[in-house]
Amino acid sequence: MNDSCDITFKEKVNIFSFEYLKCIIFIISFDDDDEYVFTKKLYSKLVTTSRILEDFLDFHGAKKNKDWVFYREIAATIQHLALACYSQRHVLNRLMFYSFESDQQETFKKEAFDTLKIIQKSIKLAGSVALEEARRLDISVPDRGYDISFFPGISSDQQLDHNIDDFNARDKQKENLTRIATEFLEVVKEFDQFAFYERYDLKKIYELVPQHINEVSIRRYEMLIHNIQSSFDSYVVNDESSSQNLMLEQLRSHFSIVFHILQVLGRLLHFYERHLYDTGYKDVYKNVSISLSYLLDPNVLLDRAVNFCLFYAWKFLSSGKALASRILNENMETSIIEVTIPKDRGFHSRPSLLVAKIVQHYGGEVKMVVNSDVFDAASVLDIQWAGGKIIKEEIENVQFKGDVRALEDLKILASVNYGEDHMGKGIPLPKELSYLS
């Protein structure tokens, strides 16, 4: 391994800054009213050059040095804003290929483009400051920026033919779709805590961020959606042109767009929490934070994070719920079981709630059959209606038909008298039903 320690810090900072500053010179060459939208290749170059510069500066302790900390923070700012823009640009590039049943695509497209331009403008402002800092620190600045031809867009005048015919065994395909649709519905259910129907004002946003909405919580959902999409791409194959094939394309579109929106949201929240949010630091760090707030107004940043990113992430998750439920019900393994009713007290509140929670946990359709009448086993109210019929007609056994996964757990629940003793008091449930606790 070559030992390069004989190269001074001063010489190395020039090396690690060169391509970064060359990008900066290119992006600030455009007037504010210029309609040029940065390409993914440009964002990628900004990300890689700013990241390696930030790593270099961190290695040499720039975060603890009052002369170098601001140059380092500007590089980190450009990196995270460029990452957000890369994901946002990806969404806009792919929007025509997404398959949605939504009628709000044009509204989303306009808001997405406006948000991209806002962040792009902030990168330009940060770039100007980066150049000033480079000159203050006597860093060599390139004579010129890159030529615009170095950053072409990704589209061209043709699409390659789809000539690979993959096919999964139908039984395996059904199993995979059942699992993936269930996981998606679980995320939708959990993410529903963030649901809102009217745009938040700034007062409400500052109450939510970062106490309730923050980078850590959003990164978790980003990873969950990414795992579902990865599983879909690995184990589900669109085998032919059919109605189900269209549904699968629509489902994957929901995975993809939500994943990339959450990427943007995560980067914006990271920038706010790490660089703008007042965590009690004083003096140098406080001054750095104030300086960065001039590059991207915290009010604007949080408005876009919440009223654009969070809103549309929830919107696209919600619009995929019915589709995922349909795919689940068409592909899940089904069966029918017959079990006894709860002894002594019948289907009152506790047994009805436990039955409904089991069905809701798996997400697939399950019906409760009482003689010739059919009830929704996911509905506590429906089960209690059935309970009245059971008492009136002195019925001792009922049937459940539908999602075999839920039926297995319903058999376990019935075997312990639906979680209560003969007096109607709750008893411990088997470990297989621990998710009901």
What are these regions (language model features)?
Residues 1-324, 424-425, 432-437:
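Long, compositionally biased, glycine/small-hydrophobic-enriched stretches that function as flexible linkers
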Residues 233-236, 266, 321, 325-328, ...:
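Signal for well-folded cores of large energy- and translation-related assemblies
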Residues 306, 341-346:
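Short, surface-exposed loop/turn motifs that are enriched in glycine and acidic residues
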Residues 333-343:
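Short amphipathic
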Residues 345-362, 373-393, 406-418:
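Amphipathic alpha-helical interaction surfaces in cytosolic regulatory modules
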Residues 393-401:
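Beta-strand/loop-dominated core regions that host nucleotide or nucleotide-derived cofactor-binding catalytic loops
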Residues 406-425, 430-437:
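C-terminal basic regulatory modules in eukaryotic proteins
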